[in-house]
Amino acid sequence: MESRIGLVLILSLFTAACGARVIHVLESVPAEYQLKLAKLPRVWVAGFATGKKPEFDLNLETVRLIRTQLRTWSSAQVIQAEPLTIDTEQRLSDVAYWRRLGEEHGRPLIVTGTVKLLLAPPQVVQRGIRTIYLPLAGRTLEATVVIIDGGSGQVLSTRKLPSRMRYGVGRFSSGLSLYFQMMDQAMPDWFGAITGTTPVSSEPNHS
């Protein structure tokens, strides 16, 4: 645990010194996830299909974030490689494609899937007998995690994560800021999908 705390401090100091975005590392994860994370083999977080023209590089940010969390909370060797650009969701079930890439990367457990950041509907507030729409910036995060055997290229599991919605005000209302806030909340869902653990809670989050 001391080594994990040290890693969190190093990451924070490094990103602060470089002026880069700080990736928040979870302070704790459910015990049932920790047991499974400790047994993970080599893992390759390959890349994600993100749909058309996301407002920032959603694939890159998701790959970076998941790799950072796995390096912190698992003993697996997390492969460092350029994120794949997955142009269609059909590619996720292309056995020959993943078998070839799996061989090139030493037959790891492959983490891929889809991640979409969508505009949220206007927020509705009831004040007495009046209903008003607040023009707050909001986003909805939708993700499906696909786990692939790097030796055979076969899909081992596919799990759609609970969707999340969040609104922000001022400097916390950008798509990137809201994305990081929702991913922070969703990380136990990601760990559950990667390790094959039954979700602690499958209720969607709206805030």
Residue spans of the language-model regions?
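Outer-membrane beta-barrel translocator domains and adjoining extracellular loop/strand segments
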Residues: 124-128, 172
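N-terminal segment of the mature soluble domain
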Residues: 39-117, 150, 154-158, 181, ...
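C-terminal/domain-edge helix-coil "capping" segments
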Residues: 18-40, 120, 136-207
